[in-house]
Curated annotation (Swiss-Prot):
It comes from the Bacteria. GO terms for biological process: D-tagatose 6-phosphate catabolic process; galactitol metabolic process; phosphoenolpyruvate-dependent sugar phosphotransferase system. SUPFAM superfamilies: Aldolase. Keywords: Galactitol metabolism. Pathway: Carbohydrate metabolism; D-tagatose 6-phosphate degradation; D-glyceraldehyde 3-phosphate and glycerone phosphate from D-tagatose 6-phosphate: step 2/2. GO terms for cellular component: plasma membrane. Component of the tagatose-1,6-bisphosphate aldolase GatYZ that is required for full activity and stability of the Y subunit. Could have a chaperone-like function for the proper and stable folding of GatY. When expressed alone, GatZ does not show any aldolase activity. Is involved in the catabolism of galactitol. This is D-tagatose-1,6-bisphosphate aldolase subunit GatZ. The gene is gatZ. Forms a complex with GatY.
């Protein structure tokens, strides 16, 4: 990460896409996408997804590391080009507990991530706990971040410290997505970004963390990009001009969250304006969902009814029977909720792919289609972009390849935005 940031600060048009997903096909897609380049691949886990208690994935930080390394080994991706990051590391998961207890768990969270070899650490203590006022005083936020940083510094060995980097600040919705519709989004004021940096500098120095300050590479801000279930707010460079100018006077860059579904030109403009770390998550699993839905339509055309996977029906049954991951986010009427379940841009279906019934039905779908020839016309009908790539000779028509390539459509847009020389 340090090299990428240094090159950006030296004037090179260079950024990095942060892949925020625990789905094996998404991770495989990201690693295959850059397999034959010299690029680093940044894969991040969030604190509610992966923590010392297992998170909603059931993985502790060391488990997630081994999970990613296992996929890397399968596809032949070198570990030295992998960067593992931890996002929203702080009291996020324990906001309903008193601050002292939540921070105690947050310290253990940080230690677990750093000990597992995660080198990009987002220190996020911005959320109020059960006995805190709302919002928290910025100095309290910074001092709590310093406590977390101290835990990281004490855990890292000398070799790890060479690669260890920190991200500070937050200007993002609740991790996991917006719970309501959005009409507009507030662009961070440069004075607030400056205050974030100043308070963290004071707090770190109070705690004897002067050296750690040199590892702070980025500040999380809101440049004016967001999405909810049905809408996308696109980047407007002129609205973020002052913010973009301010960071040039520092040794840091910005990190932008919720950049999913922006245009490839917007990604290029964001990197130009020093939002050099672009986080993406739901757009990747949305593309995965589109691919599986498309393959299910092909299955309906090619496989006899009694042999079909019924994957779309199984998804509906599971999500309606177990609505915990979507109920409070989606619209209340049944017809609207079904549209959201299937097609929402926030893609809360992503929480259900590991479910045993859904996983088995997806496996059967792929097995069924592996046993037949996929007609080009059928691929053109349901996956027209992949049909073009087949025609160009850069893709072979297996179900697995079609899914991977569909996910990589998203990554192609980020590469256009982040790469110095693009066609």
């Amino acid at each position: 990460m340090k090299e990428i940031i240094a090159r950006h600060k030296a004037g090179e048009h260079l950024g990095i896409c942060s892949v925020c997903s625990a789905h094996p096909l998404v991770i495989e897609s990201a690693l295959l996408f850059d397999l034959n380049t010299d690029n680093k691949v940044l894969i991040e886990a969030t604190s509610n997804q992966v923590n010392q208690f297992g998170g909603y994935t059931g993985m502790k930080p060391a488990d997630f590391r081994d999970f990613v390394y296992g996929i890397a080994q399968e596809v032949g991706f070198p570990r030295e080009r992998l960067i593992l990051g931890g996002d929203h590391l702080g009291p996020n998961c324990w906001q309903n507990e008193p601050a002292a207890a939540a921070m105690e768990k947050s310290v253990e969270l940080i230690k677990a991530y750093v000990a597992a070899g995660f080198s990009k650490i987002h220190l996020d203590a911005s959320m109020s706990c059960a006995d805190d006022p709302t919002p928290l005083d910025p100095m309290v936020v910074a001092r709590r971040a310093a406590v977390l940083c101290k835990a990281a510094e004490e855990t890292a060995n000398e070799e790890q410290k060479c690669h260890l980097t920190y991200v500070i600040g937050t200007e993002v919705p609740v991790p996991g997505g917006e719970a309501s519709t959005i009409g507009s989004v507030h662009v961070t004021r440069e004075v607030d970004a400056a205050r974030t940096l100043e308070t963290h500098q004071i707090a770190f120095r109070e705690s004897g963390l002067e050296e750690a300050l040199s590892r702070v590479i980025a500040i999380v801000v809101q440049p004016g990009v967001e999405f909810d279930h049905t809408q996308i707010i696109h980047y407007q460079p002129q609205a973020a001009q002052a913010l973009s100018a301010w960071i040039k006077e520092t040794p840091m860059v910005y990190e932008a969250h919720s950049t999913d579904y922006q245009t490839r030109q917007a990604y290029r403009a964001l990197v130009r304006d020093h939002y050099a770390i672009l986080k993406v998550g739901p757009a990747l699993t949305f593309a995965l969902r589109e691919a599986i839905f498309a393959l299910a339509q092909m299955e309906n055309e090619l496989i006899s009814p009694e042999q079909r996977s019924r994957v779309l029906e199984v998804i509906d049954e599971v999500m309606l029977n177990e609505p915990g991951y979507w109920k409070k986010y989606y619209r209340p009427t049944w017809s609207q909720a079904m549209v959201d379940i299937h097609f929402s841009l926030s893609d809360r279906i992503r929480y259900y792919w590991p479910h045993p019934r859904i996983r088995q039905s997806v496996e059967k779908l792929i097995a069924n289609l592996n046993n037949v020839t996929l007609p080009l016309g059928l691929i053109s009908q349901f996956m027209p972009v992949q049909f073009e790539r087949l025609s160009e000779g850069v893709l072979t028509p297996t179900p697995h390849n079609l899914i991977i390539d569909k996910i990589q459509d998203v990554l192609r847009a980020y590469r256009f935005g982040c790469t110095p020389d693009v066609a």
